[in-house]
Amino acid sequence: MAMSNNTPSTQDILHWLIQWGEDHDAVRAMLLTSSKANPNASVDIFSDYDVVLVVPDIHPFYEDRTWLLDFGEVLVVYWDPIYPMPGYGIEQFANVIQYADGLKIDFTLWPVELFRQIAQAPVLPADLDIGYTVLLDKDHLTDGMRAPTHTAYIPTPPTNETYQKVVEDFFSDAPYVAKCLWRDELLPAKWCLDYDMKHLFLRPMLEWRMEIDHRWSVPAGNLGKGLKKRLPPEIWAQLEDTYAGAAIADNWEALYRTLTLFRRVAMDVADHLSYAYPLDLDQRVTAYVQEMQHLEPGGVNRRPIR
């Protein structure tokens, strides 16, 4: 089946899900979560449906997976293993289903026992606090449940300790990237530069910088997908310039541009929060990386590079 140009409306799909839940006795409650339940989120034709199914026993749904076919022809599916929910210790699982007609549903299955505890908790889990809509509740399980605040995943100001750790960890990766580039080892260099340095350390710094302009009130989005809309355009342009193709020389330039951008943004954050940016660490690591780049193969450095 090809992706359909006549995609059913959101209300049609929700009606379909509710009817399916009503027809299956094991489904005691059903909740819609994430972007389609958050009035502050933007949605488009590719926005998926995040659905929580509350059932007496999750194992039959895990072991016999034919129920997924009730919603259409499955193109591809990913299954999480069954694992205990952090903070509760009760088993749950989730799956991600892309249907051939374009519909995408992410199901999370919670046993009734787990959901009762969540519904009665003083604080909602982030996945519910970001937004939820009760689609079906056969046993009044959601009675008295807290309303979502839609504030989950909004970054908060880092402590000085957290800020300094992000800066130190970012610069600790730079010599490794340089070593891989010097050795013409593209894959580990790109992994460390484009994932480790950028997503683990530069992205949080960019999110903090974004929040400075928005008074710590807006979510950055999963993997920073909201940054382009909310960062100053010149900072976003600098970020784009940190991405390179496969040429080693271009990746050396990308590394230096990443260092420059991080320095700029981290200094902005430090100034706003009255923290001290470790400029000495920055300068020493940058100089060391430059020295690594210009080593001749087989050359001897003042200190061995392993």
Located regions from the model:
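Catalytic metal-binding acidic patch
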Residues: 33-68, 72
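Short aromatic-enriched loop/helix-cap "lid" or pocket-rim segments at secondary-structure transitions
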Residues: 43-45, 118-121, 220
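Short alpha-helical segments and helix-capping/turn motifs at coil-helix boundaries
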Residues: 14-16, 35-37, 90-93
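Helical scaffold of the NTase/Pol beta-like nucleotidyltransferase catalytic core
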Residues: 1-32
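Conserved nucleotidyltransferase catalytic core and NTase-mimicking acidic/glycine-rich helix/loop elements
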Residues: 153-306
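Short, solvent-exposed loop/turn segments at secondary-structure junctions
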Residues: 37-38, 58, 112-114, 211
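Conserved NTP/Mg2+-binding pocket subregion across the NTase superfamily
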Residues: 2-6, 71-188, 193-194, 294, ...
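Short secondary-structure boundary/capping segments within folded domains
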Residues: 19-23, 40-45, 96-97
